[in-house]
């Protein structure tokens, strides 16, 4: 009966097409049962604070020893702040404002983009795993495939279309540079990862976390790793992102002008665990202001792609044999779409 009730609640929420923002605008003072996190999730939110020496690494793209530092961060943390990346602050600010502007619109302006078809060029939704998860998360999402074939401007939301296209081009250039540095950190030719098409595809995720009346009972986005080679995240100043490191949840406190880079599952697989995919989450927003973030994942996401990937042969040896079987990104996406967000994916490909 309980699962049936949850299913009907999820169906009603989905069919309303108003998202979490619509719930907040309706004046609710308690979160619906659909969004109440599991006891295990709530217990993890009360875990002890990390030791002070555990701080998120920062990589200066124009600094000395950048290859060594980016390699160390990718190996030990799977996530780092990136400064001096070359993208103007004005562009970053317009990107955040654009995504926030979309989500802050009246429901009718957003409904034409609402969909559960994750192969669409552009879609607005709340919780991709709404029907599979034990509890929904307190966020709404605008998703868009931005490479290799960017959408037409007229197909994008008017409030943010131009900056979406401009920003995605900036991130493509930055991503290519990051893949060069990561290739060198692996001891490979600087073009190795790019030649593997790691930078070929992009998917933009514009997340909106409205203020929550009961932030201690739900979560912004549950713990997960990204199904990507690399994710470039732009966050506003509200905060809430946390990364799991050495058995602690550590705040990824916003740094003005910086981007957050995290290694995805695909990169962990092809580097044979040399680089690690960072498990992260976002706690529910208890402030009076909405939290907005923009992630660009270097991935085909839910679109079919037949290229086969496996551990890079140049990284393997008798002492370091392949830990994963070959697979396509489509196989990975199929598992992702059939599971809850927090379900591990990499172990399905372990040898």
From Swiss-Prot:
Cofactor: Fe(2+)
Cofactor descriptive note: Binds 1 Fe(2+) ion per subunit.
EC number(s) recorded for this UniProt protein: 1.14.-.-
Residues the record lists as binding 2-oxoglutarate: 291
One of the GO BP terms on file: biosynthetic process
Alphabetically ordered keywords of this record: Iron, Metal-binding, Oxidoreductase
Disulfide bond as UniProt keyword: no
Gene3D superfamilies associated with the record: B-lactam Antibiotic, Isopenicillin N Synthase, Chain
Positions annotated to bind Fe cation: 224, 226, 280
Keyword NAD: no
Pfam families referenced in this protein's UniProt entry, alphabetically: 2OG-FeII_Oxy, DIOX_N
Any one Gene Ontology molecular-function term assigned to this protein's record: metal ion binding
Top-tier EC class: oxidoreductase
The family this protein is said to belong to: Belongs to the iron/ascorbate-dependent oxidoreductase family.
PANTHER family in UniProt: 1-AMINOCYCLOPROPANE-1-CARBOXYLATE OXIDASE HOMOLOG 4-RELATED, OXIDOREDUCTASE, 2OG-FE II OXYGENASE FAMILY PROTEIN
Listed name of the protein: 1-aminocyclopropane-1-carboxylate oxidase homolog 4
Organism of this sequence: Arabidopsis thaliana
